Design a protein with these regions (language model features):
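Cofactor-binding loop segments of dinucleotide-utilizing enzymes, especially the Rossmann-like FAD-
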Residues: 50
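Extended, alpha-helix-rich binding/interface surfaces that flank or overlap catalytic cores
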Residues: 47
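Charged, solvent-exposed interaction patches on well-folded alpha/beta domains
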Residues: 1-36, 40-43, 53, 58-71, ...
């Protein structure tokens, strides 16, 4: 009797295993059918940019033409990111898939902040010191002086000097985040202990590359002040304490 129960139990377990295996095969075939179905072929790629630059969006769309019509499950996010991150104008990429066949590509663009002149050529740089453009004309950017450079290609850093790059990055980040009406037109780093920033004809004496947020905030507040109304001269924010203001 016990032996009969054992045999029946064994048959029941075997039947359950077969049923589970069959279900897994059927589910696998269903999944395979679904992911290969034409409905999952990418037919729409939406480009979202922080600057809404039309030319860059068109360029991105051209680069991603090859993924249209491909199965959305087989196109890896990392593949799309690797295609776009080679573009010096693109700082960051985020890819979102929306089933059945839509992709959203969010790009954060590198902005032109500085311009450096060499032998009549003007290099436009982003806030990290990377070359974004090279042209004969001068852009309406912050002119960077006091740096010796060799011929550079788009996408390369303007210099190999890490200390200079750090200064460019620090100032670039602050200038890029400046939302006030005060604009800067020149940064002179020929003397790293006595860095100079200009807003039109007003010299802002920065001193060394430290405590920059405080220094620039002080300078901007003075330039915006109706009580001071300085148009030409200098503002010395290089040391702690009250800035020194000299009008000419």
């Amino acid at each position: 009797m016990e032996a009969l129960k054992y045999i029946e139990e064994k048959k029941r377990k075997k039947k359950i295993k077969k049923t589970i295996a069959l279900l897994m095969v059927l589910i696998g075939l269903l999944i395979l059918f679904l992911i290969k179905a034409p409905i999952f072929n990418i037919n729409n790629v939406k480009i979202v940019s922080n600057d809404n630059e039309v030319a860059l969006k068109d360029d991105i769309e051209n680069k991603l033409q090859g993924i249209k019509g491909r199965n959305i499950f087989y196109v890896k996010r990392s593949y799309i990111e690797s295609i776009l991150k080679n573009d010096p104008y693109i700082k960051d990429v985020k890819v979102t898939k929306a089933l059945p066949n839509n992709l959203t590509v969010e790009v954060k663009e590198n902005k032109k902040i500085f311009t450096v002149e060499q032998n009549g050529n003007y290099y436009a740089l982003d806030e990290s010191g990377k070359v974004l453009d090279k042209k004969l004309g001068e852009d309406d950017l912050v002119k960077l002086e006091g740096i010796t450079i060799q011929d550079k290609e788009i996408g390369e850093k303007i210099t190999e000097d890490e200390k200079i790059l750090e200064i460019i990055k620090d100032f670039g980040a602050l200038i890029n985040s400046n939302t006030s009406s005060i604009k800067f037109n020149k940064l002179d780093i020929s003397n790293l202990s006595n860095i100079s920033l200009y807003s039109n004809e007003v010299l802002i004496k920065i001193g060394g590359n430290f405590d920059l947020t405080r220094k620039l905030n002080n300078a901007v507040n003075i330039l915006k002040s109706d009580k001071v109304d300085i148009k030409k001269g200098y503002i010395d924010v290089s040391v702690e304490g009250n800035p020194v203001i000299k009008e000419e």
